[in-house]
Swiss-Prot record:
Function comment: Nucleoside triphosphate pyrophosphatase that hydrolyzes dTTP and UTP. May have a dual role in cell division arrest and in preventing the incorporation of modified nucleotides into cellular nucleic acids.
Sequence similarity: Belongs to the Maf family. YhdE subfamily.
Active-site residues, as the UniProt record annotates them: D70 (proton acceptor)
A Pfam family it matches: Maf
Name the record gives this protein: dTTP/UTP pyrophosphatase
Database matches in NCBIfam families: maf
Predominant localisation class: cytoplasm
Length: 192
């Protein structure tokens, strides 16, 4: 199998690939995650994922398959990572008792040929009504501070999620089903 590189600093993306016992390296991209909020959310995550993969491709000196990804939460606009504890409170109150979308853009880029596949996955997440006391306890853990939407479905915030429609791993940050399909169909790489 060709060298596989994950262009991400996300511990969640790393863990998802490690759980599959896939051999890969990590090279963190230097891309600033700035975007035009007027663009469609799917376009934003696809573009950022591409820029991350391209940045890493331009910095390595041997052939590799590079995976780039970017995840955002959408409810009446884009919800990023909280800037501070008050922002986390506001975000969690916005998501409480309602549905929102989690969109992850993925890019797989072959540095030897330049062949690139760009796609995205959308998952709907239904949150229960979260009390202010629950929000305060959750924020006190520190868990929401580095996550889009101010929550981690794989962590303590699982108690807030009533149901999802779509790929669970997409909400975590790497839609492994779609990634597996892309790697198999376009790059002849099996994750099993």
């Amino acid at each position: 199998m060709e060298r596989l590189i994950l262009a991400s600093n996300s511990p969640r993306r790393k863990e998802i690939l490690q759980n599959l016992h896939v051999k890969f390296d990590i090279i963190v991209s230097d891309v600033d995650e700035v975007f035009n909020e007027k663009d469609h959310p799917a376009k934003i995550v696809e573009t950022l994922a591409y820029l991350k993969a391209e940045d890493v491709a331009n910095r390595i000196d041997r052939d590799a398959i590079i995976i780039g990804a970017d995840t955002i939460v959408v409810k009446n606009g884009i919800i990023g990572k909280p800037k501070n504890k008050q922002d986390a409170r506001d975000i969690l109150r916005t998501l409480s008792g309602d549905v929102h979308e989690v969109i992850t853009g993925i890019v797989v880029l072959d540095t030897s040929s330049g062949y690139t596949v760009i796609d995205h996955v959308v998952t709907e997440v239904y949150m229960k009504k979260i009390t202010d006391e629950e929000i305060e306890r959750y924020i006190a853990t520190g868990e929401p501070m580095d996550k889009a939407g101010a929550y981690g479905i794989q962590g303590r915030a699982a108690v807030f999620v009533e149901k999802i429609v779509g790929d669970y791993y997409n909400v975590v940050g790497l839609p492994i089903c779609k990634l597996g399909e892309v790697l198999h169909k376009h790059f002849h790489i099996n994750l099993l």
